[in-house]
């Protein structure tokens, strides 16, 4: 047995499923998950000594690559002064100044510890500010594991939400309306049925939890217009897209102004950080200035703030996003060329530094139904064959891939060459 197999066997006796987050267990692709010993730049190194070109990037945060010296040094320096104080620090102020400068729609920001905390708190704030209970989310979009968001669509577009996890009471889910991503008609229908009851829409501007599905040109502007028409807040969940699709996020890339923005992943530089913020009048409703409660023992802790501050300063340097786009575009085009040579039907979506691979005969993938029609079994085989080639992709057909500026063009070309060999055998 390999070291990974031995560790996984031991882990399953101690951790549910042997992991601390479900997708890591390889249940979406089968087999034994890799246990990682270290990472550097664009590479992961497992406990058995094998190196992999990494396109998971810790599920998004590692836009600069692993073990970046600026972030590492910032964490070490901060740790020498203390790990957490439970009191305000100068770095919190500097971090807030930087975030609001980089994302101009955020007049104010509240730091939290995860993307789930950010979305959960933003929704509570929207409900408190508007005095309304219902929210709209989209089928196939994921916004963390808060109860009101673990909801699937009912039997029709306008049915009340149903829990999609045991432990979520139906009374929680009934206030969540699930519409079809990239389908404005379904959203308008929800507003027409509940014109005075919807507090907010929450949306991934690029859906990254049904692989990678960009918005149609009219979709995000249409959501903004509907929110304005019905007095509803628009929450853009940039946990995945923030600082990756563009420096000011997908909202800037697509030219849409939200009322609230949720951030995570890159904002922490690899440390557990989330944030939400937006319009000053809305944020003023948050405790202690307003009645909507939110708190956290480690929110804004000095280690996470130091890591995030160092990361964002590097990400804001000229050329970073041009490099991400160039590398991701080359990878997408190369994969399509290699698939075509082998007669393998493939769609590759990509925006900025994120991409999605779909095995499908369809010409495009634009919504959850398109994603569900893809060949998951073929993806599973592709994943394991690429792993054997030393390429680490997301171990699920429903998760986006992530590029970093640490990837070289040689890494990209080697990945394409590996895919060419794999497509020939699929």
Curated annotation (Swiss-Prot):
Name of this chain's protein: Glutamate-1-semialdehyde 2,1-aminomutase
Pfam families: Aminotran_3
Coiled-coil annotated residue ranges, if any: none
Enzyme class: isomerase
E.C. numbers: 5.4.3.8
Native organism taxonomy: Bacteria, Pseudomonadati, Pseudomonadota, Gammaproteobacteria, Enterobacterales
Cofactor(s) this protein cannot do without: pyridoxal 5'-phosphate
Stated family: Belongs to the class-III pyridoxal-phosphate-dependent aminotransferase family. HemL subfamily.
Location of the protein in the cell: Cytoplasm
GO cellular component, one term: cytoplasm
Keyword set includes Glycoprotein: no
Keyword annotations of the record: Cytoplasm, Isomerase, Porphyrin biosynthesis, Pyridoxal phosphate
Xref: Gene3D superfamilies: Aspartate Aminotransferase, domain 1, Type I PLP-dependent aspartate aminotransferase-like (Major domain)
Originating organism: Shigella boydii serotype 18 (strain CDC 3083-94 / BS512)
Modified residues (N6-(pyridoxal phosphate)lysine): 265
Subunit structure, as described in the record: Homodimer.
Pathway this chain belongs to: Porphyrin-containing compound metabolism; protoporphyrin-IX biosynthesis; 5-aminolevulinate from L-glutamyl-tRNA(Glu): step 2/2
GO biological process, one term: protoporphyrinogen IX biosynthetic process
Catalysis: reaction(s): (S)-4-amino-5-oxopentanoate = 5-aminolevulinate
One GO MF term attached to the UniProt entry: transaminase activity
């Amino acid at each position: 047995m390999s070291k990974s197999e031995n560790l996984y066997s031991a882990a399953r006796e101690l951790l549910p499923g042997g992991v601390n987050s479900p997708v890591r267990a390889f249940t979406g692709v089968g087999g034994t998950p890799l246990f990682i010993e270290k990472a550097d730049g664009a590479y992961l190194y497992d406990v058995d000594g094998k190196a992999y070109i990494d396109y998971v990037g810790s599920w998004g945060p590692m836009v600069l690559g692993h073990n970046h010296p600026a972030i590492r040094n910032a964490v070490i320096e901060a740790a020498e002064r203390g790990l957490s104080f439970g009191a305000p620090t100068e770095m919190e102020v500097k971090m807030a100044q930087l975030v609001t400068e980089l994302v101009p729609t955020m007049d104010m920001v509240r730091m939290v510890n995860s993307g789930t905390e950010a979305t959960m708190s933003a929704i509570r704030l929207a409900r408190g500010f508007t005095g309304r209970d219902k929210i709209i989310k989209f089928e196939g979009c994921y916004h963390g594991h808060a109860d009101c968001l673990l909801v699937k669509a009912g039997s029709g577009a306008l049915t009340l939400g149903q829990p999609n996890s045991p432990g979520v009471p139906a009374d929680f889910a009934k206030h969540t309306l699930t519409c079809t991503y990239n389908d404005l008609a379904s959203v308008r229908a929800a507003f027409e049925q509940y014109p005075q009851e919807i507090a907010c829409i929450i949306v991934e501007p690029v859906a990254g939890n049904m692989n990678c599905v960009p918005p149609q040109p009219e979709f995000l502007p249409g959501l903004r217009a509907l929110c304005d028409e019905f007095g509803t807040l628009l929450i853009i969940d940039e946990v995945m897209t923030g600082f990756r699709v563009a420096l000011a996020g997908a909202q800037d890339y697509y030219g849409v102004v939200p009322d609230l923005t949720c951030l995570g992943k890159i904002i922490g530089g690899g440390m557990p950080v989330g944030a939400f913020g937006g319009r000053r009048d809305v944020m003023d409703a948050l405790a202690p200035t307003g009645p909507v409660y939110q708190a956290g023992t480690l929110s804004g802790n000095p280690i996470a703030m130091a890591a995030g501050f160092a990361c964002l300063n590097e990400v804001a340097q000229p050329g970073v996003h041009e490099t991400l786009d160039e590398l991701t575009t080359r990878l997408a085009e190369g994969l399509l060329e290699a698939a075509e040579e082998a007669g393998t039907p493939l769609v590759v979506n990509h925006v900025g530094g994120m991409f999605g691979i779909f095995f499908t005969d369809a010409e495009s993938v634009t919504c959850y139904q398109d994603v569900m029609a893809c060949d998951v079994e073929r993806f599973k085989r592709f994943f394991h064959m690429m792993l054997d080639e030393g390429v680490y992709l997301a171990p699920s057909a429903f998760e986006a891939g992530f590029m970093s500026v640490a990837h070289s063009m040689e890494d990209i070309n080697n990945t394409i060459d590996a895919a060419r060999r794999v497509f020939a055998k699929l």
